[in-house]
Amino acid sequence: MGDKDDRFPKKKKGGTKDMDALKKEVPITEHKMSVEEVCRKFQTDVVQGLTNAKAAEFLLRDGPNALTPPPTTPEWVKFCRQLFGGFSILLWTGAILCFLAYAIQAATEDEPAGDNLYLGIVLTAVVVITGCFSYFQEAKSSKIMESFKNMVPQQALVIREGEKVQVNAEEVMAGDLIEVKGGDRIPADIRVTSAHGCKVDNSSLTGESEPQSRSPDCTHDNPLETRNIAFFSTNCVEGTARGIVICTGDRTVMGRIATLTSGLETGKTPIAVEIEHFIHIITGVAVFLGVTFFILAIILGYTWLKAVIFLIGIIVANVPEGLLATVTVCLTLTAKRMAKKNCLVKNLEAVETLGSTSTICSDKTGTLTQNRMTVAHMWFDNQIHEADTTEDQSGAAFDKSSVTWLSLSRVAPLCNRAQFKPRQDSVSILKRDVAGDASESALLKCIELSCGSVRMMRDKNKKVAEIPFNPTNKYQLSIHETEDPNDNRYLLVMKGALERILDRCSTIMLQGKEQPMDEEMKEAFQNAYMELGGLGERVLGFRHLLLPEDQYPKGFAFDTDDVNFQTDNLCFVGLMSMIDPPRAAVPDAVGKCRSAGIKVIMVTGDHPITAKAIAKGVGIISEGNETVEDIAARLNIPVSQVNPRDAKACVIHGSDLKDLSQDQMDDILRNHTEIVFARTSPQQKLIIVEGCQRLGAIVAVTGDGVNDSPALKKADIGVAMGISGSDVSKQAADMILLDDNFASIVTGVEEGRLIFDNLKKSIAYTLTSNIPEITPFLFFIIVNIPLALGTITILCIDLGTDMGSAISLAYETAESDIMKRQPRNPCRDKLVNERLISIAYGQIGMIQALGGFFSYFVILAENGFLPSQLVGIRLNWDDRSLNDLEDSYGQQWTYEQRKIVEFTCHTAFFVSIVVVQWADLIICKTRRNSVFQQGMKNKILIFGLFEETALAAFLSYCPGMDVALRMYPLKPTWWFWAFPYSFLIFVYDEARKLILCRNPGGWVEKETYY
């Protein structure tokens, strides 16, 4: 490695090129080189290691063995985003316009009204308070790189100039010769030069749950699958190994994933896009009304300055002050509800994103499966038996008295190094922690359940010699004394890979008797092996032999290094196959996803056969759907002759995936409904997510390993596992499944869809009162009547009576089975659309305005000012110097008296809006169903009705409100003037819904169904 290793892209302006380079497959070639070639490349020695001088030189050249921290976003920037992003912009604009209007009034009037100033202050307070609330709800620093740092080993054992030295992991250099043992964390990417029973846990990197053997031999072209490379930050679980460091820091496979994850840019969440669209609509409506009435005011002879104040007033009146807080609280309530169902949401906007999801890319191990190997089948006496792993052995379906089974159930626990961890007697067997690898743990639990105490069995059959499993032999062997006091022979037991069974066995046990292993039995054996292997199960063979006492007498010294005992002509006893079984709730959850129109794609680092078997087991590949390989096998033709379009399902290997063009990838995603990606790298997982997004899908990704973190970050919503998930995956994700169960995602989808529907209802309810709030201002300008509703009372509606009721709609249950409809189309199905605006502003809002004005005109008429007399009276009404304004009865009114009547009208108009909002709240419970069909089961909504009524009564009758908020007591009869309009709203909307149900897809639905 004479020149600086350039396999890792340098930081430069072409950031996109850097990211594209990172998405490519790992550019490691050292696994294909001989040890001598690797030594030459890195200027090192396989025995002596680097010289101290070379190590110092390489440290200067390459820098420390550490991950480069990404630029982090300061907390104040995050706070500002909450304060000035999305919906807040609309309120800030309103506040600035209010201050501007007040400034104009202050500059042109002797005694300017303070309404605009108060409104500006309140709007500012609303934005700041809601911004703080959102910030603290979502407060999370970008700790992705910090969690990667936690995975970095602190110390490493290196050999320099022939001496073993313990150094800080950051000082490990490319070319260093290092030594690792069981329990160590690998300090860099290393090319293994020697190994003794070494196994590493690559699950965080590749997703494989089984520990992988390491040896000096190249076993695969793919560096992630070969046995002679050990990766930075993975764990050595047993054995020892030596190797030459080939990559450090950012150049390691883990470093590439870290840089890829932290460098990914994520787009806006669907709800953020919807809120932006809503702002555009509201701004458009506000500006249109404002400009229209600005022109009208100029035509009517108002001064330019007055017209500007009117323009600002109308724009501000269109701002729904309470809606930002309502949306935030609704999302928070749903997030809390989801947390109770094991879905912890880190980002409030992610609550709705899950409901919009159209594609779920799910990891296999631990998400769809239980993340624990379990014995699934056994083959003995020439029959396949299903294993019984129930605690009470109620599922047993084979003869446990069979002599062959008794022999198999003796070999399996004796030729096994796994053991239960201490102090777990009260824990059920299936849930006990085991010291040992996954396959041996499965065998241990199976035998403990079926036959009783394994420890007792081992005590009775004392082990005297053992050859541990190694990749070369592919078997494990142990020799035991037998429990029969009258038999002094030693029992040799062996288990291992299938390819090593037949050549070591001369006999097979059938019905408890040894018989020759003839061709017929070999064929039966192969058929059983192929059948179990085809189910994606890991198959192990078991055999035994009672060693002749004359050759191996009591006390014989067995030598396991230079084998001095018989290891062939054994008796084959049976097969046992293991699989990481699907979670019980997953098939039902996948079925619900399918009925909800959500495509579930499996993306795993595991073997294609295993992945396909699990996919079929959980319903990702449904019964009857075939892959091209299945079609080829059925028709007995080569795979190349099968048209890929004929196969609804497909299983794609990572090695094939890397050769696909973007168009080919899009073609697969578009034309196959059921897809499994196997043996995928972290970069490929990311490419799959980007491919789905390119086709317009809203993608959810589930994962638990470091290998999943780039895809989790890029997805529209990343879902990490709370129990088995790495810190890195949890930091990259938007949501965490506390129970690691895929079925919880379906619950989340349901909640997400429900909150979208309920937000629509909340917004429709809130926007409706905008019209009775705006129209008094318009009549004030055009007809020149006294103002019917003041700024203060508008604030009491938006931030007082309306808010609790709007939030109560978040508790509304679904109208129909929302998991039976297709996912929301982000282009067509908007949170706020023209139909919602038409209903809220053009229909229900107009009826509400009529109710408010009816109360207004009745009160003024009772006080002597008939409607005909009010037209054009505004200038005299608001003239402070005029204290003898005459009404229709001939009474003279001072300015103060007139204002008391006006403020009483404001209060009556306010109460009228509350009364008509009762009906609006009830009709907003549903968008299509009749309220009678839905019922009044939402107790929070009923409370909301009482709350807004009680608040209105409090504001009307509480002493001191006339001074504080200019609200005056009303006669009890004045509360009833708006009742007919409230009833009219209810009847009108029920009639609309009846037509919707009777004539689906008709004109009424096209124009009014929001």
From Swiss-Prot:
Compartment annotation: Cell membrane
Segments crossing the lipid bilayer: 75-95, 119-139, 276-295, 308-325, 760-779, 790-810, 831-853, 906-925, 939-957, 973-993
Region (Interaction with phosphoinositide-3 kinase): 69-71
Residue intervals annotated with topology Extracellular: 96-118, 296-307, 780-789, 854-905, 958-972
Entry GO MF terms: ATP binding; ATP hydrolysis activity; metal ion binding; P-type sodium:potassium-exchanging transporter activity
Catalytic activity: K(+)(out) + Na(+)(in) + ATP + H2O = K(+)(in) + Na(+)(out) + ADP + phosphate + H(+)
Polar residues bias (residue ranges): 201-216
SMART domains in UniProt: Cation_ATPase_N
Membrane disposition: Multi-pass membrane protein
UniProt entry keywords in alphabetical sequence: ATP-binding, Cell membrane, Ion transport, Magnesium, Membrane, Metal-binding, Nucleotide-binding, Phosphoprotein, Potassium, Potassium transport, Sodium, Sodium transport, Sodium/potassium transport, Translocase, Transmembrane, Transmembrane helix, Transport
Active site, per annotation: 363
E.C. number: 7.2.2.13
Assigned GO CC terms: endoplasmic reticulum; Golgi apparatus; plasma membrane; synapse
Binding site for Mg(2+): 704, 708
Regions of this protein lying in the Cytoplasmic compartment: 1-74, 140-275, 326-759, 811-830, 926-938, 994-1010
Residue ranges of the region described as Disordered: 1-21, 201-221
GO biological process: intracellular potassium ion homeostasis; intracellular sodium ion homeostasis; potassium ion import across plasma membrane; proton transmembrane transport; sodium ion export across plasma membrane
InterPro entries tied to this protein: ATPase_P-typ_cation-transptr_C (IPR006068), ATPase_P-typ_cation-transptr_N (IPR004014), ATPase_P-typ_cyto_dom_N (IPR023299), ATPase_P-typ_P_site (IPR018303), ATPase_P-typ_TM_dom_sf (IPR023298), ATPase_P-typ_transduc_dom_A_sf (IPR008250), Cation_transp_ATPase_P-type (IPR050510), HAD-like_sf (IPR036412)
Signal peptide range in chain numbering: none
Post-translational modification Phosphoserine, affected residues: 930
UniProt key word Iron: no
Known function: This is the catalytic component of the active enzyme, which catalyzes the hydrolysis of ATP coupled with the exchange of sodium and potassium ions across the plasma membrane. This action creates the electrochemical gradient of sodium and potassium ions, providing the energy for active transport of various nutrients.
Family affiliation: Belongs to the cation transport ATPase (P-type) (TC 3.A.3) family. Type IIC subfamily.
Quaternary structure and interacting proteins, as annotated: The sodium/potassium-transporting ATPase is composed of a catalytic alpha subunit, an auxiliary non-catalytic beta subunit and an additional regulatory subunit.
Protein name: Sodium/potassium-transporting ATPase subunit alpha-3
UniProt source species: Oreochromis mossambicus (Mozambique tilapia)
Gene name for this UniProt entry: atp1a3
